[in-house]
């Protein structure tokens, strides 16, 4: 028997079947770094229209987690897809480097500033620590395959950036948005500092819930208001609170002007409550025998005075819109120093903003004899005992409720009125302008707009001052007596910024006021406060984007972060940009959900359900992690587990196998001389290129809309359905058995080449390592990297006017599917082994029959059978299988006649008819020794 294997065009490629990504990717990264791939891309894209995705800086503390990976990979997919879309899209990664978490780490290792070393030395240690954290995170981000200017990132602790942050504050002051006030702010007693809204988390806490009676100063006046005289005992207005420790700061009782308030007689006294809450309050305090003596509107009680139960002064009843009937008594204990609503109404009524609590959370001396020096959370029991002793406590019980806590310490925080600096939301119209700007931004998903609108509409003034050591100084001088800002504040801030640009923030603390103020220095003091770190990151549109040369003065097109950043970076950036420039700092804002485990649970080390990106990269490779990110709908929670990553690895194998098939079958193909013109190609090959063209249109639309899971789904459909289960199966016969340089084979290779050129680019933003690997095996002259080019423009398709157009082949796909069902049944029944052992007869109605007949002898190649004939639908025998998909089709199967050709494996009756090649079929003889077979359709 002759060996005809050498006459076949068997697939061959050096592209490995196994990705072996965990081992192979680091080598690719080394090449990218050695070649300065990021620099090559920048040079290639120079002069193109820009797309700027501004990196929200992660905090320089700790290793990256799976959420960081999601964030950076999404950004990288966008930047790379924009590059392929013809944009110059520079990516400058950044880090947030100041603030409390770094201070705490340094304190743990070295102690607090002023103890073992100076504040200046402490700042130097903080800077050093942040730099090591940046280096660690940078290595992991690079390992993810994220391309960016990693050698020149922006750090909020860069001297120039620190200086520009000071300049941003100067601009805000110049525009009239800064004011000083003793407003209640979130205060962590462990941090001994104010906290931003975004630094507050909520946890369940058990607190005492108490009902307290404030006795009326003028009993007769109250009786007159209610038009009653027969009251037994004193009259009191009853408040309800879950923070007894705030009662020393009580300066009023708030009631609602439009609520009905009832005077209720109980045993030995009368109490005033909201009428709608009488029943629930009576149940709570255990009173069953009571009488409503009368009712009045809350407005009638305004400014009547009531005695504080133990502080020795009386307080007014005032009217407030914040009073509700959700719980309590309808009368709200009001302490302007301990709550934002209380503060606002206190300002309206001219109440004292009392703050009896020190920065460590203990009462200041002179507050009350049994409370001085006591921690506020330990004082609740003392206050309850005091109220009991004074006869003012109507009820006490334990209650679990959601309570604000410090994001760092996880401990309860307090509202505390302290002298702070604020960016005003309303004094110069910042709130109104911000709300206007929000409407001009595209929010992805679109619910983000309503979310941030609600936050901006309801947020208080922004407290931007902090009492910390490691932070950008506010760089202000205030008058010793008046506490007014120096009249030359903006000029002085610029002088400070120039010094900071050279020596960093330490320049402020080293500065002698006389250097800038001269003889005035004795009248002014340096403000010791630092800026909220959210001001640092929120001003990067100015301190970074406006000044980096690669951005060329363009504003950011996109901000992309997790959904918690509506109240964080998106908010602070919007506030600062609008306060500085009157406009939003971004055109698009995209948010992604949080990562959860396979059961939808939050990631937690204590549960043990965390997924480490480092582990995934070391086991499966970064491309698997990237494919998981891209294939998950980021608009909701993003589930990840070993099982989910295994599914991503399975999808990856399908894509890789498709790419490998294309490369292996392009062996020996030189596009410069072997390309077949479209009009000379086999029709099926043109259809396949048209499939790629349609897929590319869908994929590019999905990239443009940031619907990456749609990109992956379309890519998978193309690889699995259109290519894998149809086209690639059909062409194997022609590709392997036709003459090597025949039009039949070169047509097929031309199609594969066009498809591969498109496919490698579709993959590149997501499967960056694999795309780079594929790129290196593609035939023909090309740039060194796929990332410097653009989407492939060489695709074409069939015209609708052609007889064998897309609709024709779509119908053929269905016919092929129906034939496959019959073959599978025959294989199950042991009638045939493989499809080439079968011959099929297609009984079709006239319209379908005409289409099938048009393919002539090539119909069998489409169906992967050794024989295929078309007959009239009405002539079908009883055992012919009726198609469920095509009403006018029945399929009958028989065993193919003739012998099996050892070269092409088809069964034919002309095997051995040519004496010189007595073992193979006539078609193979032509391909081996003759002019070669001609293919027109398939």
Curated annotation (Swiss-Prot):
Top EC class of this enzyme: ligase
Reactions this protein catalyses: tRNA(Ile) + L-isoleucine + ATP = L-isoleucyl-tRNA(Ile) + AMP + diphosphate
Entry's localization field: Cytoplasm
Gene Ontology molecular-function annotations: aminoacyl-tRNA deacylase activity; ATP binding; isoleucine-tRNA ligase activity; tRNA binding; zinc ion binding
Motif 'KMSKS' region in this chain: 602-606
Cofactor info, note text: Binds 1 zinc ion per subunit.
Binding site for ATP: 605
GO cellular component terms attached to this protein's record: cytosol
Positions of L-isoleucyl-5'-AMP binding: 561
Domain of life where this protein originates: Bacteria
UniProt keyword DNA repair, yes or no: no
Obligatory cofactor(s): Zn(2+)
SUPFAM superfamilies on file: Anticodon-binding domain of a subclass of class I aminoacyl-tRNA synthetases, Nucleotidylyl transferase, ValRS/IleRS/LeuRS editing domain
Protein EC: 6.1.1.5
Positions where N6-acetyllysine occurs in the chain: 183
Keyword Nucleotide-binding: yes
Signal sequence region: none
Record key words, sorted: Acetylation, Aminoacyl-tRNA synthetase, ATP-binding, Cytoplasm, Ligase, Metal-binding, Nucleotide-binding, Protein biosynthesis, Zinc
Motif ('HIGH' region): 58-68
General function of this protein: Catalyzes the attachment of isoleucine to tRNA(Ile). As IleRS can inadvertently accommodate and process structurally similar amino acids such as valine, to avoid such errors it has two additional distinct tRNA(Ile)-dependent editing activities. One activity is designated as 'pretransfer' editing and involves the hydrolysis of activated Val-AMP. The other activity is designated 'posttransfer' editing and involves deacylation of mischarged Val-tRNA(Ile).
Subunit comment: Monomer.
Similarity comment: family membership: Belongs to the class-I aminoacyl-tRNA synthetase family. IleS type 1 subfamily.
NCBIfam families noted in UniProt: ileS
Domain remarks: IleRS has two distinct active sites: one for aminoacylation and one for editing. The misactivated valine is translocated from the active site to the editing site, which sterically excludes the correctly activated isoleucine. The single editing site contains two valyl binding pockets, one specific for each substrate (Val-AMP or Val-tRNA(Ile)).
Protein name per the record: Isoleucine--tRNA ligase
Species, as recorded: Escherichia coli O17:K52:H18 (strain UMN026 / ExPEC)
Gene: ileS
């Amino acid at each position: 028997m002759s060996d005809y294997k050498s006459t076949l065009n068997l697939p061959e490629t050096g592209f490995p079947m196994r990705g072996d990504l965990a081992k192979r990717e680091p080598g690719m990264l080394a090449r990218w770094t050695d070649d300065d791939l990021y620099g090559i891309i920048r040079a290639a894209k120079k002069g193109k229209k820009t797309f700027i995705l501004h990196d929200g800086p992660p905090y320089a503390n700790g290793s990256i987690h799976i959420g960081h990976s999601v964030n950076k990979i999404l950004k990288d997919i966008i930047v790379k897809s924009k590059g392929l879309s013809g944009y110059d899209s520079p990516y400058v990664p950044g880090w947030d480097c100041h603030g409390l978490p770094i201070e705490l780490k340094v304190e743990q290792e070295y102690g607090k500033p002023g103890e073992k070393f100076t504040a200046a030395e402490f700042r130097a240690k903080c800077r050093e620590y942040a730099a090591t954290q940046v280096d660690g995170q940078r290595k992991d981000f690079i390992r993810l395959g994220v391309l960016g200017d990693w050698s020149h990132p922006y750090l909020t602790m860069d001297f120039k950036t620190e200086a520009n942050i000071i300049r941003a504050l100067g601009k805000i002051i110049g525009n009239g948005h800064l004011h000083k006030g003793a407003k209640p702010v979130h205060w962590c007693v462990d941090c001994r500092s104010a906290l931003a809204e975004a630094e507050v988390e909520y946890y369940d806490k058990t607190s005492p819930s108490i009902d307290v009676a404030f006795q009326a100063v003028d009993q007769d006046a109250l009786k007159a208001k209610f038009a009653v005289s027969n009251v037994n005992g004193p009259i009191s207005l009853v408040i309800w609170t879950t923070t007894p420790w705030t009662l020393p700061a009580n300066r009023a009782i708030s009631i609602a002007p439009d609520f009905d308030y009832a005077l209720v007689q109980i045993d030995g006294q009368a109490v005033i409550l909201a009428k709608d809450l009488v029943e629930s309050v009576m149940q709570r305090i255990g009173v069953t025998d009571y009488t409503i003596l009368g009712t009045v509107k809350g407005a009638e009680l305004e400014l009547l005075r009531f005695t504080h139960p133990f502080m020795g002064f009386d307080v007014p009843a005032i009217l407030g819109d914040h009073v509700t009937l959700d719980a309590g008594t309808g009368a709200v204990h009001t302490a302007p120093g301990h709550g934002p609503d209380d503060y606002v109404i206190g300002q309206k009524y001219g109440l004292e903003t009392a703050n009896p609590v020190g920065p460590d959370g203990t009462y200041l001396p002179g507050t009350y004899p049994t409370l001085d020096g006591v921690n506020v959370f330990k004082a609740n029991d003392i206050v309850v005992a005091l109220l009991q002793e004074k006869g003012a406590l109507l009820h006490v019980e334990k209650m679990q409720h959601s309570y604000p806590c410090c994001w760092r310490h996880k401990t309860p925080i307090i509202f505390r009125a302290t002298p702070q600096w604020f960016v005003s939301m309303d004094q110069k119209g910042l709130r109104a302008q911000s709300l206007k700007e929000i409407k001009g931004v595209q929010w992805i998903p679109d619910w983000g707009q309503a979310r941030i609108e609600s936050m901006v509409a309801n947020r208080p003034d922004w407290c931007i001052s902090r009492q910390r050591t490691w932070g950008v100084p506010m760089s202000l001088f205030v008058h010793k007596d008046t506490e007014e800002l120096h009249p030359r504040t903006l000029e002085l801030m610029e002088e400070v910024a120039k010094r900071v640009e050279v020596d960093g923030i330490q320049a402020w603390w080293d500065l002698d006021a006389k250097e800038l103020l001269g003889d005035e220095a004795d009248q002014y003091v340096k403000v010791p406060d630092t800026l909220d770190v959210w001001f640092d990151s929120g001003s990067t549109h100015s301190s970074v984007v406006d000044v980096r040369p690669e951005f060329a003065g363009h504003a950011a097109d996109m901000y992309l972060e997790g959904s918690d950043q509506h109240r964080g970076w998106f908010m602070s950036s919007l506030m600062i940009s609008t306060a500085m420039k009157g406009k939003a700092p971004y055109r698009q804002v995209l948010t992604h959900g949080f990562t959860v485990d396979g059961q939808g649970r939050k990631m937690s080390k204590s549960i043990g359900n965390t997924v480490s990106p480092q582990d995934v990269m070391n086991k499966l490779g970064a491309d698997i992690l990237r494919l998981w990110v891209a294939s998950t709908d980021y608009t909701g929670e993003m589930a990840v587990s070993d099982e989910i990553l295994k599914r991503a690895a399975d999808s990856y194998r399908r894509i890789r196998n498709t790419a490998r098939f294309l490369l292996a079958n392009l062996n020996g193909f030189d596009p410069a001389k072997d390309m077949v013109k479209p009009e000379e190609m086999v029709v099926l090959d043109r259809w396949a290129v048209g499939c790629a063209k349609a897929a590319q249109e869908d994929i590019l639309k999905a990239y443009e809309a940031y619907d990456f899971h749609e990109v992956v789904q379309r890519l998978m459909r193309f690889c699995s359905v259109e290519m894998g289960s149809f086209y690639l199966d059909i062409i194997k016969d022609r590709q392997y058995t036709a003459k090597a340089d025949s039009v039949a084979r070169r047509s097929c290779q031309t199609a594969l080449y066009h498809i591969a050129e498109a496919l490698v680019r579709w993959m590149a933003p997501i499967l960056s390592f694999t795309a780079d690997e594929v790129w290196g095996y593609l035939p023909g002259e090309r740039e060194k990297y796929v990332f410097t080019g653009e989407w492939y423009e060489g695709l074409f398709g069939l015209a609708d006017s052609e007889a064998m157009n897309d609709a024709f082949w779509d119908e053929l796909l269905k016919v092929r599917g129906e034939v496959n069902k019959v073959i599978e049944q025959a294989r199950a029944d042991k009638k045939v082994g493989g499809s080439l052992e079968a011959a099929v007869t297609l009984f079709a109605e006239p319209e379908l029959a005409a289409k099938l007949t048009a393919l002539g002898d090539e119909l069998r190649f489409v169906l992967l059978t050794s024989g295929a004939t078309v007959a009239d639908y009405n002539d079908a025998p009883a055992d012919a299988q009726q198609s469920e998909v095509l009403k006018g089709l029945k399929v009958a199967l028989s065993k193919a006649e003739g012998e099996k050709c050892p070269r092409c494996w088809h069964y034919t009756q002309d095997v051995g008819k040519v004496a010189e090649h007595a073992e193979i079929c006539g078609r193979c003889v032509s391909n081996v020794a003759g002019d070669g077979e001609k293919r027109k359709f398939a």
